[in-house]
């Protein structure tokens, strides 16, 4: 059965439950985005640019997740949100490249300080 209001697939009860979960998931994406934006405001230009790139990844992940139409997806995969939004970001190859670049710059900076 499909709920015409949400266009989500599943029984009426599944769709109702999934819509509640979906609202919570969207709120979690908002919370994580707010934290990254707050952090970015305190960073220097290069690091801020990287954090803004992470925000782009976050919004792409949000669109991907929120675009799912199967009630079962939200019920099965998102019932317990926890750190799932952060994990989606951390597993992204672009985030891994940003992290690797940061670590490389940190090592280079430490080596320069040591002389």
Per-segment meaning from a language model:
Residues 1-115:
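Charged, low-complexity intrinsically disordered segments and flexible loops
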